[in-house]
Amino acid sequence: DTLDAEGAREQAAAATRAVEEGAELGPLHGIPVAIMDVHSVKGFRNGLLGRDSVNYDEIAVERIRKAGGIIIGTTATYNWAVAEKPRNPWNLELDPGNSSRGSAIAVVAGMVPLAIGMDGAGSTRLPAAWSGCMGLHTSKGLVPYVDYDSPSFRSTSTAGPMARDARDCALLLQVIAGPDGRDFQALQLPVPDYTAHIDDGIEGMDIAWTDDFGWSKAYWLPDSAGVVEFVKNAAFGLARSGAQVHEIDDVWDEPMPIFNLLSKHLPG
């Protein structure tokens, strides 16, 4: 977790000059962005690699810079993307979720409007839910990635946007998604306009609800009945907006053996 206040001011001054000179502006022009420190950002610490400074930007970071975003710093993670700090911005006695917690906190606390997280097993979604922002686990290959220092890490994880609302999340995804010739696993698909249908509503959508995702009751930790009830009420409340909500009770094979096998290939 590193703050580059001086560098951010320099980038902001350059962004101001670009406006004054009538230069072409990118979709993130002048917007502060924080990057989870498992991502490589030139000149910043990479917590995953245990390096105080790396000498290159990964592809998503390149695209943020090109779009005019101002990278003000990196957010805290921890070994194997699990940590003791930071704490929940709403209550310091509560946990803010797992590894992308630093990015979630930076967004929710108003430090930045946009951040990048990482998700392999809920690492973006849980901090977003627990801290109160939007977090997206992107499909494999949607956001290209190449890192020759830890090539196996992204076999289970993908980079994704975190923001205060769906529109901002879509805006950041618009910038970082799309194929790149350096990543042979990148999806070779055109990037749609992710903001185009945000105001369309959910009438007619089919939405599935499960209280354990098909395996947690049988194989994992017990659920909180209160949390399950609140989320279930929220899910079925979507029917009032025209969605078709269906409860499913499928039971899947336990995922942990496969996850543990993949994890053995993670660096460190």
Where are these regions (language model features)?
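Short, small-residue-rich loop/turn micro-motifs
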Residues: 35-39, 75, 140, 147, ...
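Alpha-helical scaffold segments in soluble metabolic enzymes
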Residues: 14, 63-66, 138, 168-175, ...
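Short low-complexity, flexible loop/linker segments enriched in glycine and/or proline
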Residues: 85-90, 129-132, 255-267
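Generic structural signal for helix capping and beta-alpha/helix-loop junctions
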Residues: 79-81, 123-124, 217, 255
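Gly/Ser-rich catalytic/binding loops embedded in alpha/beta enzyme cores
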Residues: 1-121
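Amidase signature
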Residues: 1-23, 175-268
